[in-house]
């Protein structure tokens, strides 16, 4: 309400993760050294604020966000959220860990559990391997989620395929 003057978000389009959506609302995020405009707000609303940033974003904003699992905000960096009707400073900025969304049904088929770590092989023209953690959620759409720094480092694009090495559970 403080930022947009209303209780709910305006639905814009669905996200791949079941029940989640991009809203029409955008805001500016500000740190001590800079700001980033037109940051899309995702719904549905939760009972906490979270801003997922990359390390490159941290440099631009002048913040030191910790790497955390989504929703785990202990030690999150302070960030100012600026909407059309006001602004608020909240401890909400994190660098999200690399994670693989998966439904409970698919997790059972693959023999993996929530928070389990695996090796992911990336076979682009700039190949490599990374470690990622499973995030088992109801209606989870099977998808690897990386920040822009990781994706750009491997020249990955949305909807590219990667290989999960289930033999190399960590």
Spans of features found by a protein language model:
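Short beta-strand-centered segments at strand-helix junctions
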Residues: 1-32, 37-115, 121, 131-161
């Amino acid at each position: 309400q403080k930022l947009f003057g209303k209780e709910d978000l305006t639905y814009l389009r669905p996200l791949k993760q079941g029940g989640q959506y991009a809203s029409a609302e955008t805001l500016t995020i500000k740190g001590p050294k800079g700001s980033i405009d037109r940051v899309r707000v995702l719904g549905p609303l939760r009972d906490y604020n979270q801003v997922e940033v990359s390390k490159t974003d941290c440099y631009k904003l002048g913040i030191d966000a910790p790497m955390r699992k989504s929703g785990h905000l202990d030690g999150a960096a302070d960030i100012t959220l600026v909407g059309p009707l006001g602004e608020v400073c909240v401890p909400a900025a994190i660098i999200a860990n690399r994670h693989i969304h998966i439904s409970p049904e698919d997790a059972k088929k693959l023999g993996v559990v929530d928070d389990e770590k695996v090796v992911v092989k990336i076979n682009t023209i700039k190949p490599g391997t990374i470690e990622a953690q499973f995030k088992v959620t109801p209606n989870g759409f099977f998808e690897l989620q990386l920040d822009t720094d990781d994706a750009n480092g491997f020249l990955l694009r949305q909807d590219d395929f990667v290989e999960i090495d289930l033999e190399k559970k960590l």
